[in-house]
C-alpha cells in the first residue's frame, strides 16, 4: 500500500487563522458571547453542572462564557494558538476548561456530554460532504443519550438573499477584501 499525499484543507492552515482571527473575533463578536452562551443554555435546556462540548471553539469566546454560567466545558479546535489564547482567557476569568487540539473529523472522547455546540458558522468548512457527516457522527458519539447539539449555520435561503461576490471593509487596523462564489447545489 503506497502512501498517498492528502491535500491540506484551507481551514487547516494555521497562518490563515492567525491573520484572520483579529478580524473574525473582533470586539463586537466578544461582546455578543455572553448573550449567545445564555441562549445556548436555554436552547439546550442546560443547568449548572451540565457538560458541554464546544466544537471548533476557536479562541474560547463561547467556551469561557458557558463556563462562567456554571457549565463544565470542553473545547476542541484544530488551531493550537487559538487554544492557547482560550486557556489564557479562561485562566483570567477564573474558570476551568479542558481545551483539546484536534480536528473534529478524527476527535473522539470517552467522556459523554449533555450538549455540544458549534457556533459562528464553523460547520461546513470541509470540501467533502462525507467529512461533514463524519463530524456530525463524532459529535453524536460524544453526546449522552438524549443530548442536544446546537449548530449555528447559515441557511441556503439566507445565503442566497444576502449573497455578494465580495466586499472591502476595514477592521482591526486592516483592509480586507472578501470574495465569494457559489458552487453546485445552489441552483433553483
Predicted regions and their residues:
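Conserved class I S-adenosyl-L-methionine
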Residues: 1-47, 49-56
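Conserved SAM/SAH-binding loop
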Residues: 59
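Class I SAM-dependent methyltransferase SAM/SAH-binding core
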Residues: 63-106
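A short acidic, Gly/Pro-enriched loop at the edge of an enzyme's catalytic core
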Residues: 108-115
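Residues lining the SAM
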Residues: 119-121
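A short glycine-rich, Lys/Arg-flanked "PGG" loop and its adjoining helix->strand segment in the class I
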Residues: 133-145
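SAM-dependent methyltransferase
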Residues: 150-188
Amino acid at each position: 500500500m503506497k502512501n498517498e499525499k492528502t491535500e491540506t484543507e484551507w481551514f487547516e492552515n494555521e497562518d490563515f487563522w492567525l491573520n484572520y482571527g483579529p478580524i473574525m473575533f473582533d470586539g463586537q463578536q466578544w461582546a455578543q458571547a455572553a448573550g449567545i452562551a445564555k441562549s445556548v443554555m436555554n436552547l439546550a435546556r442546560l443547568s449548572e453542572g451540565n457538560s458541554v462540548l464546544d466544537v471548533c471553539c476557536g479562541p474560547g469566546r463561547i467556551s469561557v462564557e458557558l463556563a462562567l454560567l456554571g457549565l463544565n466545558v470542553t473545547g476542541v479546535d484544530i488551531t493550537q494558538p487559538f487554544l492557547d489564547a482560550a486557556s489564557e482567557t479562561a485562566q483570567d476569568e477564573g474558570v476551568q476548561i479542558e481545551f483539546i487540539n484536534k480536528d473534529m473529523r478524527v476527535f473522539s472522547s470517552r467522556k459523554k456530554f449533555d450538549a455540544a455546540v458549534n457556533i459562528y458558522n464553523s460547520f461546513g468548512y470541509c470540501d467533502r460532504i462525507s467529512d461533514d457527516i463524519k463530524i456530525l457522527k463524532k459529535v453524536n458519539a460524544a453526546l449522552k443519550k438524549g443530548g442536544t447539539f446546537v449548530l449555528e449555520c447559515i441557511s441556503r435561503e439566507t445565503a442566497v438573499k444576502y449573497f455578494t461576490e465580495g466586499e472591502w471593509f476595514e477592521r482591526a487596523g486592516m483592509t480586507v477584501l472578501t470574495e465569494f462564489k457559489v458552487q453546485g447545489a445552489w441552483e433553483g
